[in-house]
């Protein structure tokens, strides 16, 4: 009986040991698969003496995005200030970005037009990273339609996020500046010049909920929020 009991315990131990090994193998395989499927597209622009002078947008294949910029937040600012914001892209925009990156051969070839006669519109850079690629391209202007579309999309997103940056500043330090800023934002949104309005919903909601802000200003904030929720921009 003692021998049998010992044998059963050993077999039980080995069974659990095998289970842990199997689970570990499955977990490692899942992590490897996630790494293989995970991809990132980054767009950055550096344009001295503009506002902002620098910004970058990093987009992951799961839709998570991060925006960083530096520049003067208002005309009264003496020094450049850095700004960061994290948000989730709409499924449509996320899919479009990675589709355009694929059509652009993940920026592995020549992207810049090479035309030195064109005006300088900022040093732009596109980066693509996944399990099989780590490629990038720098350009002032590209004649490739897919790169042009990506550039326009990222610039429209940056326009929205810079409105968010300024609205955050005005709401905290200069509420009288909110009216003109929101009017301009609504006008540009209706003209199709802004993208991913939901990325700045937090500050718009804060303005709308602030009873110390004029009703007409809060109404503009609500209007822009509704436009973002409807996915019209």
Which residue ranges define each predicted feature?
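Extracytoplasmic
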Residues: 38-40, 52-54, 60-62, 92, ...
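A short, surface-exposed interaction/processing loop segment used at functional sites
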Residues: 65-79, 156-166
């Amino acid at each position: 009986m003692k021998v049998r009991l010992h044998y059963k315990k050993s077999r039980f131990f080995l069974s659990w040991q095998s289970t842990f090994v199997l689970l570990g193998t499955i977990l490692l395989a899942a992590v490897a698969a996630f790494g293989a499927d995970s991809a990132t597209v980054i767009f950055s622009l550096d344009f001295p003496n503009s506002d902002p002078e620098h910004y970058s947008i990093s987009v992951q294949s799961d839709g998570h995005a991060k925006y960083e910029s530096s520049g003067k937040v208002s005309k009264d600012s003496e020094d450049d200030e850095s700004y960061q914001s994290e948000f989730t892209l709409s499924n449509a925009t996320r899919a479009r970005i990675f589709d355009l990156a694929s059509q652009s051969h993940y920026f592995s070839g020549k992207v810049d037009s090479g035309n030195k006669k064109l005006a300088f519109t900022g040093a732009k850079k596109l980066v693509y990273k996944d399990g099989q690629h780590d490629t990038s391209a720098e350009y002032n202007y590209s004649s490739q339609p897919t790169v042009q579309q990506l550039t326009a999309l990222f610039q429209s997103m940056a326009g929205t996020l810079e409105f968010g940056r300024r609205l955050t500043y005005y709401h905290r330090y200069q509420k009288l500046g909110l009216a003109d800023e929101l009017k301009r934002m609504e006008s540009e949104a209706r003209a199709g010049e802004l993208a991913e309005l939901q990325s700045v919903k937090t500050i718009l909601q804060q303005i709308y909920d602030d009873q110390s802000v004029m009703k007409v200003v809060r109404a503009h904030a609500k209007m822009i929020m509704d436009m973002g929720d409807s996915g019209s921009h």
